[in-house]
Amino acid sequence: MILYQALSSYQILECIVHRQVYHREEKCILILGTYITERMPRYRELETKKLFDEVYLFRFGGYRGSEEKIIREVGEELRKTLPYDIRSFEKILAAGIHTYLQVYLISGKIPFEMFEDGSGALSRPWILAEIHRKSAPGRYSLIEQYGLYDHRSPLITKKYCDMRSQEPDFEDERAVDFQVMERFRELPERMQKEVRGVFDVPELEGEADAVLLLTQQFANLGQLSLEGQISIYRHLFDYYLRGRKVLIKPPSGRYPVL
């Protein structure tokens, strides 16, 4: 029995594809954050379409107090959420390891495998670490202490990543090349269609002249001012996208056509 964890849409896709490639015939459980009900209303289709055998919602946030108190409460929440002993899984694969759940696993000497947070992120751990250091310094301190930003914990046994997108001098003996989109395209067409449906991704046939703009929350994450973020998109439209049909994917996952 295999346990997957995902926090974002991209990470859910990583888990779906990995399961289809490596563990298609095994019983696979998926843990998502409770907030997924708003971000991904069709998340239950992950189970009904048999992309995973069972899906459970775990409260990743809202823990306060000392390190010992947080670890204890996370363990209690996990036992309420998951009808299995966490140690009964053959493998645990976590996408988005900067959480108190991974602190709990490491404190209990429970090994797990990880996925990078985005293409090329494994060799650039400072990006996410700096965002969290500014936005949640208390949480950052504890998670950094457990080696979850730079992935140095020896209990992380494998690190799935896009090797082509890493820094030129990147080396890690635990890194495993995992090209998410290439592997996705290798899946049967029926499976690809079902996955797109879960994410509400439209068919783009006949849109050869269209541009898909993938947006980021730079301002909300403290990486840019709101004015700076607006300036980026204004320059894109003024100098590169004028007269083009643009499909904008906001962080919410919707795809309006402008």
Please name every model-derived segment.
Residues 1-3:
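Extreme N-terminal starter segment of soluble prokaryotic enzymes
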Residues 5-151, 155:
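Active-site and donor-binding regions of nucleotide-sugar-utilizing enzymes
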Residues 13-16, 71-80, 225-239, 258:
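Well-ordered, non-membrane alpha-helical segments in soluble/globular domains
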Residues 34, 118, 217-219, 252:
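Residue-level signal for short, function-critical loop segments
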Residues 131-218:
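A nucleotide-sugar donor-handling region in carbohydrate enzymes
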